Amino acid sequence: MRKSVLEKDVISQLHQKSIEIPVIGITGGKGGVGKSTTAVNIAEAFLQTGHKVSLVDADVDSPDDHTLLNIPLNNPRDVAITQPLFNDSNCTRCRKCVDVCRINALFQPKNSIPILISDCNGCEACFLVCPSDAIERGEKIVGKTYMTEMGNLRLFTGELIPGVEESAFVVNALKDELLMKLTIQI
């Protein structure tokens, strides 16, 4: 009788060194070629053979693994980036924050404090160069992460707020949540 490729002894033979948690990644560039469908089908195959599965939907612009699995998104957590808030009384109007901003998100009218005129990407360079401690840390929500548990499946999902360009912050928050959950459980 032929063994399934999902049996533990077959999986262990595929790896040169022993690993506690096998990882399968489905990646690619172009949308609509079936990455999510493939990932969900592989997850389902492992679930049907009794394995515990953590599925990560890091397509934060258009997450749809939960739709393909017909399960809700649970346990939402906001993902925020740092935004500068200017303290008028401390600002010396030196323009260092405006000059260091690589995306030109800051504008400083003559004899005034800087103004945030476009989306800040949260790099925090302005905080580092301000000589008078005139910038306080504010937050802007850029997305959410979710963690849904259904039986032996744990689905981690990241979702970017439409119109926001900084998807890396949501992907990194998703990765951190996954690693934290796996570290606690191991």
Walk through the language-model features, giving the residues of each.
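Walker A (P-loop) phosphate-binding motif
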Residues: 14-49, 53
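Short beta-strand-centered segment that lines the nucleotide-binding/catalytic pocket of NTP-utilizing
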Residues: 51-66, 138-144
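FAD-binding core/adjacent interface of flavoenzyme oxidoreductases
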Residues: 139-151, 155-169
